[in-house]
Amino acid sequence: MLSVPALAAESGTENLVRSKTYTGQFSDLPEDHTFYKNVAALYEYGLSVGQADGTFGLTAPMTVGQTVIFAGRIRSLYRTGDPEAGPAAFAAAAVSQKDAWRVYAPYLWYLQSEGVLDKALDDCLTQPATRAQMAHVLANLLPEEALPLINDSLVTQGYASRRRITDVTEYTPYYQDILKLYRCGVSIGSNAAGSFFPNAPITRGAAAAMLTRIVDPALRLTPDWNLTDLFSAEGAAYEDLVTIGEYIAAPA
């Protein structure tokens, strides 16, 4: 049975600091790219060094296991100040695992030992990750004091009206986790309707955006949704809402 390591440093947002400076390390990341700030932040927080060829791989898909690795690093950074300290405690136990599992297991077991990830994805670590699976990996990564629900009311209203995030229903895998990312400012969707595209594969660029919004409050977003018409009658009296017509008696 795996033992849970004792971690010396106190956990907290004060551990989420940028320890590096991004100076163009990724050859495929122009400064005007949508995810430039996110990918640069991922490097500066010590969460990624990119791919072997010197690129970040913005449009490349990610496996479920790779999302788990990034999540494990963030959790460890929050808990210890070191993105690898937590998973490292499980590295010896992972030596007996085969192939990619040997790489993924320390991060997976670490997250599970922390109680922030279940076993739902254990059998698909080598498969391409969907955006819904990414949401499941991230949803409980930090406590609410570190990841507050800054958009709770707006997202609740937009979703309940079925005018926003319409491609996510109660039958969508991990739909509660997806909605939590909206409530926390980690996602605002991919179009004006706030669509999440839960079954689409997550790219490394889109993943970088979500990951760094988890870590850095300054990168979190609020949807630009105008829902005022939903409450245009708030405070109105009944007689203001109902047009009184002419009385016509029923025929005898």
Model-based region annotation:
Residues 46, 185:
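Phosphate/pyrophosphate-binding loop motifs in nucleotide- or prenyl diphosphate-using proteins
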Residues 41-42, 111, 181:
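PEST-like intrinsically disordered low-complexity regions enriched in serine, proline, threonine
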Residues 37-45:
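Mature N-terminal segment immediately following signal peptide/propeptide cleavage
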Residues 2-34, 49-65, 72-105, 112-132, ...:
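Feature responds to low-complexity, polar/acidic, surface-exposed segments characteristic
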Residues 39, 169-172, 178:
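Intrinsic, low-complexity N-terminal interaction/targeting segments
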Residues 203-210:
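C-terminal/domain-terminus segments
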